[in-house]
A protein has these predicted regions:
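Short, glycine/acidic-enriched loop or turn micro-motifs at the edges of active sites
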Residues: 110-113, 227, 266
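Conserved beta-strand -> loop -> alpha-helix junction used to position metal-binding or nucleic-acid-contacting
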Residues: 218-229
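Short, mixed charged/polar active-site loops
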Residues: 24-26, 139-143, 217
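Conserved non-catalytic scaffold segment of RNase H-like nuclease domains
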Residues: 100-105, 109-203
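Acidic, Mg2+-coordinating catalytic module of metal-dependent nucleases/exonucleases
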Residues: 191-200, 204-211, 240-280
Length: 280
C-alpha cells in the first residue's frame, strides 16, 4: 500500500509514526532502509511510502513494515521544500542516462584465484576479458576476447583452471597484461565509450591489475548497471545478472560457464532490455 503523510514522531532506532484517520500509526524500517533514510526522518518531514498493509509486532509495538520510500522532503520557509529523496527524480535521471550514452562498451573480467593450498601474499589479477562495443541502438561495432597471463603470480592456479574450465588451448592464447592494456587502451581512445559493468568488482579489479603492472589508470566512464537496477526498482537485495536476464527474456539460461565474453554479451542484453522497459 502507499501513503502520503507527515511524520508525527520518530521513536527508537527504526520506528516512526504518522497520524492516519485520527490515530497514531507505527511504521518500522529494516536495517538497509535505516542506514539509507533514517537520518532524514524528523518530526514534520513529508514522506511518501510503500508499506505492508498488515502490521506485525516489533519490539512490543504493532507496526507496518516499510517496503520502500518514494519521496522524503521537509518544509523550508513558506512555499519551499528541501527534497532529500524522490524516486521519480532518480528514475528520470536514469532514463536520461541510458537513452543518451553512446557508444557503449560492455565488459566482464575473470580473475586468477587463490589456490586450494593458500599462496602467501596472493593477489588476484585479471586473466580473461570479454568486451562488446555497440552503438546506442545495440548494433555491434566490435567484439574482443582476451586471455591474459597473470604477472605477480605468473601461474594460473589449479582452482582457477577448474572453475573457468581452462585447457591448454586457453593458456596458449594468453598474452601479457601490458599487451592487453595496449590493445584495450587503443579501443578506448578511438571510441571513448561509456563502460557498462554489472557491480563494482570489475571496476576495482581493473584498477588493481593496472597498479600491479604499473599501467596508468584509464579513467573510464564506468556505469554500474546493477546499481541502476537497484535504484530504479528500489530493490532491497541486489539481483544477479543472470536472474535479470531470465526475468527480462522469460527464458532459462544454459548452465553458466564463467566465460567473460559470454557474460559481456549477457550484460549487453540486460542493458537493452532494461532500456526498453523503462523508456516507453
Amino acid at each position: 500500500m502507499q501513503l502520503t503523510a507527515l511524520v508525527h514522531s520518530v521513536e527508537g532506532d527504526s520506528f516512526f509514526t504518522v497520524i492516519k484517520d485520527g490515530r497514531k500509526v507505527y511504521f518500522y524500517l529494516q536495517k538497509n532502509l535505516v542506514k539509507k533514510f533514517y537520518k532524514y526522518l524528523n518530526k514534520g518531514a513529508y514522506v511518501v511510502i510503500d508499506y505492508e498493509d498488515v502490521p506485525v509486532k516489533r519490539k512490543n509495538v504493532c507496526a507496518h513494515k516499510i517496503n520502500h520510500f518514494i519521496a522524503i522532503s521537509v518544509p523550508k520557509y513558506r512555499y519551499n521544500r528541501v527534497v532529500y529523496y524522490d524516486l521519480e527524480v532518480i528514475r528520470d535521471g536514469i532514463r536520461d542516462l541510458v537513452s543518451s550514452i553512446n557508444p557503449i562498451m560492455f565488459i566482464d573480467f575473470e580473475m586468477n584465484m587463490q589456490d586450494y593450498q593458500a599462496i602467501p601474499n596472493f593477489e588476484q589479477e585479471i586473466i580473461e576479458t570479454g568486451m562488446v562495443l555497440t552503438n546506442k541502438d545495440g548494433a555491434i561495432i566490435k567484439i574482443k576476447h582476451w586471455y591474459i597471463k597473470p604477472t605477480k603470480f605468473p601461474r594460473i592456479t589449479k582452482r582457477a583452471m577448474k572453475f573457468l574450465h581452462y585447457t591448454n588451448y586457453e593458456l596458449s592464447k594468453a598474452i601479457s597484461f601490458r599487451q592487453f592494456y595496449k590493445e584495450f587502451a587503443q579501443i578506448v581512445k578511438e571510441y571513448n565509450p561509456y563502460v557498462i559493468v554489472w557491480g563494482k568488482s570489475d571496476i576495482t579489479q581493473l584498477k588493481k591489475t593496472c597498479q600491479i603492472n604499473s599501467c596508468p589508470d584509464l579513467k573510464l566512464r564506468f556505469v554500474n548497471l546493477l546499481q541502476l537496477h537497484t535504484n530504479y526498482y528500489n530493490l532491497k537485495n541486489s539481483p544477479g545478472l543472470f536472474s535479470m536476464w531470465e526475468t527480462y527474456t522469460n527464458s532459462k539460461l544454459p548452465e553458466q560457464k564463467h566465460n567473460s565474453l559470454e557474460d559481456a554479451l549477457v550484460t549487453k542484453d540486460v542493458f537493452f532490455k532494461f532500456k526498453e522497459t523503462i523508456i516507453k
